[in-house]
Amino acid sequence: MQQHLMQMQPMMAGYYPSNVTSDHIQQYLDENKSLILKIVESQNSGKLSECAENQARLQRNLMYLAAIADSQPQPPSVHSQYGSAGGGMIQGEGGSHYLQQQQATQQQQMTQQSLMAARSSMLYAQQQQQQQPYATLQHQQLHHSQLGMSSSSGGGGSSGLHILQGEAGGFHDFGRGKPEMGSGGGGEGRGGSSGDGGETLYLKSSDDGN
């Protein structure tokens, strides 16, 4: 069906735009949707030749739909519809004339909506092509930032260990300083006698007390 549509494209371009129906445009929209999915899949799998071929086909379809949209006449306003309908009623054929205009307006609106969907699909395909390298770069940056956070957290743990070791050493030095302070106080209480003599006097006084 896709090849048939591509063969019909040059023939339909020479026809009057009223020959283009909404069903014909919908077929092109369905084909464009499948082409977009194929383009994304081929980009992810690294099939560059297939991706380029699908992109070229999508571009041709979108250019054809854009040409149809540009050649479509603008729908008449509501005032002109009612005015022409009133004139037709005066002439005796207002009912059928108004109905024909209503149907033509609805068909033009459906065609324009289909063409707007085609243009939005083209923008989506272009955004997918542009965002893919940026998404890969953002993923790499996120990976590097996570590695940096892990290394920094590891350094923080080692620094915390050094702090604990320093505090433990400080407590150890403070404990060793306590006997020195006690021995110094004992020396002052005994009138500056030597450390050995002070211990002997302390033992003798203990024996006398027993």
UniProtKB/Swiss-Prot annotation:
Q: Describe the function of this protein.
A: Transcription coactivator that plays a role in the regulation of cell expansion in leaf and cotyledons tissues. Component of a network formed by miR396, the GRFs and their interacting factors (GIFs) acting in the regulation of meristem function, at least partially through the control of cell proliferation. Appears to function synergistically with GRF1 as a transcriptional coactivator. Acts together with GRF5 for the development of appropriate leaf size and shape through the promotion and/or maintenance of cell proliferation activity in leaf primordia.
**Has UniProt tagged this entry with the keyword Transcription?**
yes
**GO MF annotations for this entry?**
transcription coactivator activity
Chain intervals with Low complexity compositional bias: 135-152
Spell out the Gly residues composition-biased ranges.
182-198
The disruption phenotype is: Small and narrow lateral organs, such as leaves, cotyledons, and flowers. Significant defects in the number of cells in both the leaf blade and leaf petiole. Excessive postmitotic cell enlargement in leaves (compensation phenotype). Plant missing GIF1/AN3 and OLI2, OLI5 or OLI7 have a strong compensation phenotype. The double mutant an3 han-30 exhibits severe defects in cotyledon development such as ectopic roots formation at the apical region of the embryo and seedlings, and associated with an abnormal expansion of PLT1 expression from the basal embryonic region to the apical region.
What family does the database annotate? Belongs to the SS18 family.
- Region (Disordered) residue ranges read 135-210
A Pfam family of the record is SSXT
Oligomeric state and interaction partners are given as: Interacts with GRF1, GRF2, GRF5 and GRF9.
Protein name (database record) = GRF1-interacting factor 1
Keywords (alphabetical) are: Activator, Transcription, Transcription regulation
Q: Which source organism?
A: Arabidopsis thaliana
Query: Which GO BP annotation is one of this protein's?
Result: leaf development
Q: List the disulfide bonds.
A: none
What tissues is it present in?
Strongly expressed in actively growing and developing tissues, such as roots, upper stems, and shoot tips and flower buds. Also expressed in mature flowers. Not expressed in the shoot apical meristem (SAM). Highly accumulated in the proximal part of leaf primordia, in the key proliferative zone at the junction region between the leaf blade and leaf petiole.
Originating gene? GIF1
